[in-house]
Amino acid sequence: MVSLKTGILGGTFDPIHTGHLILAEEVKKRLGLDEIIFIPTGQPYYKADKTISPAADRLNMVKLAISGKPYFRVMDIEIKRSGPTYTADTLNDLKLILPEKTELYFILGWDNLEALPRWHKASEIIRLCQLVAVPRIGQAKPDVDELDDKLPGLQQSLIMLSKPEVDVSSSLVRERLENGQGVEHLVPEAVAAYIKEHGLYHRQ
């Protein structure tokens, strides 16, 4: 059986934006991945004190954003799970759901790579997948040797990419919408229409 190379891109996607899509396209191309699965978070443990948009809206926006791209798909496994969202649990679930020979490539920003040694079951994460670390605007490149000291084995599981650097964030999109500004080119057209139709991110 031929191995399937599957990228995993998790996030709150509140909302999904063009930066997420550019990133996914670039990683797929650079690493020769067969597909990328977008996984909207339930209630991330690191955002437990923050209000995020309803899971159904975030899931629907991802579906709209990736429509027409057969190598992109979305799974709601974290949304369906009760309690906090942990990456190690998601990767274990994917190992059970996906075909046996699937190789997982977990995509994360340099900022999250820096924090990885403090993540729940971090050593299990690096055992279950290849990490694909991508730059974040304004984020210095992490010291991988130092991180490997904190989390032995990390370097063997790590692919560091120097691009794409995408200057778009969900918080920027939300801020512009709250201020009544346009978000053309920041989110796909279908997502912008959904946001408008459902009155998301507008000041009450």
From Swiss-Prot:
Indicate the transmembrane segments per the record: none
Single GO BP term: NAD biosynthetic process
InterPro entries in UniProt: Cyt_trans-like (IPR004821), NadD/NMNAT (IPR005248), Rossmann-like_a/b/a_fold (IPR014729)
Which keywords appear in this protein's UniProt record, sorted alphabetically?
Answer: ATP-binding, NAD, Nucleotide-binding, Nucleotidyltransferase, Pyridine nucleotide biosynthesis, Transferase
Which pathway features in its UniProt record? Cofactor biosynthesis; NAD(+) biosynthesis; deamido-NAD(+) from nicotinate D-ribonucleotide: step 1/1
Q: Which GO terms describe its molecular function?
A: ATP binding; nicotinate-nucleotide adenylyltransferase activity
Q: Which Pfam families does UniProt cross-reference here?
A: CTP_transf_like
- What's the superkingdom here? Bacteria
**Catalytic activity annotation:** nicotinate beta-D-ribonucleotide + ATP + H(+) = deamido-NAD(+) + diphosphate
What EC number(s) does its UniProt record assign?
Answer: 2.7.7.18
Q: What does this protein do?
A: Catalyzes the reversible adenylation of nicotinate mononucleotide (NaMN) to nicotinic acid adenine dinucleotide (NaAD).
Membership in a protein family: Belongs to the NadD family.
Give the protein's recorded name. Probable nicotinate-nucleotide adenylyltransferase
Q: Source species, please?
A: Dehalococcoides mccartyi (strain ATCC BAA-2266 / KCTC 15142 / 195)
Q: What is the lineage of its organism?
A: Bacteria, Bacillati, Chloroflexota, Dehalococcoidia, Dehalococcoidales
